[in-house]
Amino acid sequence: MTEHAIVIGAGFGGLAAAARLRAMGRRVTVLEAGNQPGGRARAFEREGFHFDAGPTVITAPHLFDELFELFGKDRRDYFDLVPVDPFYRVVFPDGRHFDYVGDDERLLAQIAEFNPSDVAGYQRLVSHSKRIFDVGYTQLVDADFSRFGDMMRIVPDLVRLRAYKSLYGLVSEYIQDDALRQVFTFQPLLIGGNPFRAPGIYLLIHWLERKWGVHFAMGGTAAIVRGLTRLLDEVGVELRLNAPVERIEVVNGRAKGVLLADGTFLGSDIIVSNADPAMVYTRLIDSSARRKHSDASVARKRYS
């Protein structure tokens, strides 16, 4: 009998997990509490205009390509991604602006206009960002981290690369001009982070953008959601909207299914949740079934 997998949440992560589970031969059901898929990448319309409610740019397009290739399909048949140039335009209060681009010659020329002595510093910064990328992304993107030792193995490398420093502090070691420091440290703002507190590991984003560019989905991120849900429908994944999960049923330490808000019980061999972890622990899993992550410990967590 084919194993049944339930995915809670139809955001990008949930839809991607559903695709990978289906490619592994599982029967998959995606449960979404809202009335449309997408999660934080949902879209809405107001006065004839369409808005992305969450993310707007894509910096690793090949990850979407992989999902479609699992089924022998071409992502371009579902939605289009176009490179953005410049990646970003940073505008300062004094009227100056900086076009953050992928072309070295154009980028270095702009840096020289702001502060010629920062050209050499930027080149060292790029080298540092690549080293952090090689550890913080290449080695960790597929890491399990189910065991504490898995994470501890890469700590020496991150310490050596000073990734424990704040992003702003790390960039300031190489860049002297305050405006340029802002240009190369704003990325944590995109996920609600503070460049003065976010760890230096975020410097890897700079190399990631140089490596793969910044892309926009024609039609907005809603087009990506439509493409992914179309793919899942074609390969036999069931997507249920307006289906909030009330509780994850745990028996003898193993999740056995979910209880929906309408009283429906769905049995499952595998449960993957793409919902916020704090909500999952405190609202979906009974405290008696949690070896750790008590309500009190979750309440003490700090969020960006």
Task: List where the protein language model places each region.
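N-terminal glycine-rich phosphate/pyrophosphate-binding loop and immediately adjacent elements
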Residues: 2-131
